[in-house]
């Protein structure tokens, strides 16, 4: 061995490699041209012997200055065209040299865009990618961790020993390593040594697949290997604004909609049973449905109900079922509880085939403190703020993203693009927007920091939301972006170029609270609370509102919708039908949570599934029939959706009959002759000849009655419709003399002929 190449720095570098403190392994490892000869240095912990195979010759590598650092001299430049034979513990195996691949994976333009916060496809560079480099297949790893002292790939490939595969630090805090010996399905993590010497094992923030809980490693997975057949759907979606169409959303949690017996195993395509993922301790012997099973069972169910969209509570990978998915650790991976990314793609694909859009809950407001996640990622507060007064939700036990950091915003904005591009989703609902907008959200005085202007607005979060929505609609003009924003923050659904946040829909939390408060009141006392029903119209046109009865209203002791209602069972059913019908006739898009469509009795519990056995009883079938028919009516009557955000589409007839708790109003399309008359009676009293003024004489067909026998009601009504009478009331010369069933909503449509 030539002594001149055995310098002291080699020993020093080898010690750093052993101690996982080397951020520049390419400086010493791989092929080097030194003193007119080609030298290959190989780092092989625990190896007994190392040889180099090159051009049908074998060259023994000698240990130099360290027992695990081996060196061989080759007669010419080997490039990548050599293999390493390793004898370890009596077993020999052959592999390619990871450190023979020296080219940068993340180019200058990529780094620049990422540092700016404008790399909208950063997932195509970050994370683990199956590629072919110099005719050799393998996995390219790339991660951002500027403050780390060293990073290694750990996994089954090296017995989870970080001494084997140190990564190369590049410009911009990027770390890279090509692993020719790894393949699809391999599990891995990043072992990060901090400047203080602490070691963290982190899952891949950009990982496309992760292990099933309670394990939390990342899994190498192909990205673009799915054949979509929804091009017509996507083209139609992006050709026009979706908010001017009927939108009726079924919000649901995949893990608690329906469970299956563990005895009934899901079979893979090859006939092998898949290992079941237990559902919960509440029902021993049950398991979660897989994405393919949900494709076969959920999609036909939602289609039969007539909903236009499914909204999925978060399916990004999360470690704890009890978080409902809102504490995300795997932002770029559909949870593996239900199957593979491609199986989820097929779920979306099938939804589109059946005319159903898919909305995902997206959680850019906070993240959990799990050790394998983003928290203190490289030994510093990389993704979160360092000061807990702005970087932590103590009540939730989660951390807040540092939106002022370009790379963090890039991580989130690209994640938004990722779900639309890679999984063809149609919309997002952004969770807990208010917690992002206000620095003092759920914080007492002294535990928050004012902004640069002395206010409580989180200016950085505002800019992030504006950027996210701007980029989203730039790429996907037909997308839905829905804000769960519970305050009166202005211009939530106004365009960003007008100073708005850029969403195109906002949950109407005020309507929801008012209506639930109202319907929980004994009907005899509702006359004193009429304003709760009518107030929403006074602000209805300040935003593009979506009416939502969500999961948040059926947990934590709040009871499910049916059991919020006062009175005996008959009144509970009737009140529920009346509320749902009123919701479908009120301006705004619609969302209800699973179980409401058939009158679930128990509170929602993430560990359980729905009370499907209730459908054996007629009143529950009746509520389901009501939802089915409301969705058909809703889609067939443009007056119920076409002018949701235009005052032209709504007009009170009478909202002041407090003593009877009756309200009446009209909905209309652009054609002024297309009026729908809606009359709601929110007491158990029946009115036999209640007069309602209408703008045009003629016959008004009763097109819906929530008291119909098909829905479990008393079947009181108007025998199919009513002819107007000449009677001056409500500022109209014509009137309808109607029978108003108890606790009901009736809908009438003017027809020129009977």
UniProtKB/Swiss-Prot annotation:
InterPro entries: A-amylase/branching_C, Branching_enzy, GlgB, GlgB_N, GlgB_N_E_set_prok, Glyco_hydro_13_cat_dom, Glyco_hydro_13_N, Glyco_hydro_b. The gene is glgB. Monomer. Pathway: Glycan biosynthesis; glycogen biosynthesis. NCBIfam families: branching_enzym (TIGR01515), PRK05402.1 (NF003811), PRK12313.1 (NF008967). Belongs to the glycosyl hydrolase 13 family. GlgB subfamily. The keyword Transferase applies. GO terms for molecular function: 1,4-alpha-glucan branching enzyme activity; cation binding; hydrolase activity, hydrolyzing O-glycosyl compounds. The keyword Transferase applies. Catalyzes the formation of the alpha-1,6-glucosidic linkages in glycogen by scission of a 1,4-alpha-linked oligosaccharide from growing alpha-1,4-glucan chains and the subsequent attachment of the oligosaccharide to the alpha-1,6 position. This is 1,4-alpha-glucan branching enzyme GlgB. GO terms for cellular component: cytosol. Gene3D superfamilies: Glycosidases, Golgi alpha-mannosidase II, Immunoglobulins. One of its GO terms (biological process) is glycogen biosynthetic process. Keywords: Carbohydrate metabolism, Glycogen biosynthesis, Glycogen metabolism, Glycosyltransferase, Transferase. It catalyses: Transfers a segment of a (1->4)-alpha-D-glucan chain to a primary hydroxy group in a similar glucan chain. It is an enzyme of class 2 (transferase). SMART domains: Aamy. CDD domains: AmyAc_Glg_BE (cd11322), E_set_GBE_prok_N (cd02855). Its EC number is 2.4.1.18. It comes from the Bacteria. The active site is at 431 (nucleophile), 484 (proton donor).
């Amino acid at each position: 061995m030539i002594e001149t190449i055995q310098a002291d720095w080699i020993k020093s570098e080898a010690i750093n490699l052993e101690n996982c403190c080397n951020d520049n392994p390419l400086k010493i490892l791989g092929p080097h041209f030194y003193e007119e000869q080609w030298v290959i240095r190989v780092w092989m912990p625990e190896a007994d012997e190392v040889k180099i195979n090159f051009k049908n010759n074998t060259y023994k590598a000698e240990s130099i200055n360290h027992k695990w650092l081996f060196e061989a001299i080759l007669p010419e430049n080997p490039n990548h065209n050599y293999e390493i034979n390793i004898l370890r513990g009596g077993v020999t195996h052959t592999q390619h040299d990871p450190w023979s691949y020296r080219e940068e994976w993340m180019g200058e333009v990529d780094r620049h865009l990422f540092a700016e916060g404008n790399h909208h496809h950063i997932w195509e560079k970050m994370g683990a990618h199956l590629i072919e480099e110099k005719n050799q297949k393998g996995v390219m790893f790339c991660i951002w961790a500027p403050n780390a002292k060293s990073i290694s790939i750990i996994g089954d490939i090296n017995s989870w020993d970080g001494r084997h595969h140190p990564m190369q630090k590049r410009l911009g805090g990027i770390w890279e390593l090509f692993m020719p010996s790894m393949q699809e399905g391999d599990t891995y993590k990043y072992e990060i040594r901090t400047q203080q010497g602490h070691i963290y094992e982190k899952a891949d923030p950009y990982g496309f697949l992760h292990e099933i809980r309670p394990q939390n490693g990342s899994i190498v997975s192909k990205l673009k290997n799915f054949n979509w057949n929804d091009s017509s759907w996507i083209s139609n979606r992006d050709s026009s604004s979706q908010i001017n169409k009927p939108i009726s959303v079924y919000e649901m949690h995949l893990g608690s909609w329906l469970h299956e017996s563990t005895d009934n195993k899901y079979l893979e395509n090859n006939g092998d049973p898949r290992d079941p993922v237990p559902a919960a301790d509440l029902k021993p012997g049950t398991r979660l449905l897989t994405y393919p099973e949900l494709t076969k069972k959920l999609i036909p169910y939602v289609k039969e109900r007539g909903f236009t969209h499914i909204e999925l509570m978060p399916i990004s990978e999360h470690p704890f079922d009890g978080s409902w998915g809102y504490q995300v650790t795997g932002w770029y991976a559909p949870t593996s509880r239900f199957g593979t990314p491609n199986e989820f793609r097929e779920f979306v694909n099938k939804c589109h085939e059946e005319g159903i859009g898919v909305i995902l809950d997206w959680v850019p407001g906070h993240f959990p403190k799990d050790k394998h996640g983003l928290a203190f990622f490289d030994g510093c507060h990389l993704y979160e703020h360092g000061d807990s007064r702005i970087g932590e939700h103590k009540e939730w036990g989660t951390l807040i993203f540092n939106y002022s950091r370009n790379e963090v915003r890039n991580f989130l904005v690209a994640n938004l693009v990722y779900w639309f591009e890679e999984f063809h989703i149609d919309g997002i609902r952004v969770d807990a927007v208010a917690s992002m907008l206000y620095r003092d959200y759920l914080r007492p005085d002294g535990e928050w920091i004012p902004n640069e202007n002395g206010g409580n607005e989180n200016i950085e979060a505002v800019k992030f939301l504006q950027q996210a929505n701007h980029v989203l609609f730039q790429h996907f003009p037909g997308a839905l972006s829905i804000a769960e924003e519970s305050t009166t923050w202005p211009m939530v659904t106004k365009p960003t170029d007008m100073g708005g946040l850029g969403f195109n829909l906002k949950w109407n939390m005020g309507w929801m609270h008012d209506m639930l408060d109202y319907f929980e009141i004994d009907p005899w006392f509702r006359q004193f609370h009429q304003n709760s029903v009518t107030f929403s119209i006074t602000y209805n046109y300040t935003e593009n509102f979506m009416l939502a009865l969500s999961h948040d209203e059926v947990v934590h002791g709040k009871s499910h919708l049916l059991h919020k209602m006062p009175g005996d069972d008959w009144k509970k059913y009737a009140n529920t039908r009346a509320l749902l019908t009123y919701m479908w006739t009120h301006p705004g898009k619609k969302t209800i949570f699973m179980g409401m469509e058939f009158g679930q009795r128990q509170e929602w519990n993430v560990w359980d599934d729905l009370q499907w056995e209730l459908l054996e009883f007629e009143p529950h079938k009746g509520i389901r029939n009501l939802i089915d028919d409301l969705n058909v009516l809703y889609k067939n009557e443009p007056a119920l959706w076409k002018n949701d955000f235009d005052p032209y589409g709504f007009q009170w007839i009478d909202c002041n009959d407090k003593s009877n708790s009756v309200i009446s109003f009209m909905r209309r399309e652009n054609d002024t002759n297309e009026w729908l008359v809606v009359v709601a009676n929110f007491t158990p009293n029946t009115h036999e000849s209640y007069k309602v003024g209408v703008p045009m004489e003629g016959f008004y067909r009763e097109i819906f009655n929530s008291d119909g026998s098909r829905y479990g009601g008393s079947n009181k009504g108007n025998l199919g419709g009513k002819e107007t009478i000449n009677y001056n009331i409500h500022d109209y010369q014509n009137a309808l003399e109607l029978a108003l069933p108890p606790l009901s909503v009736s809908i009438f449509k003017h027809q020129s002929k009977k």
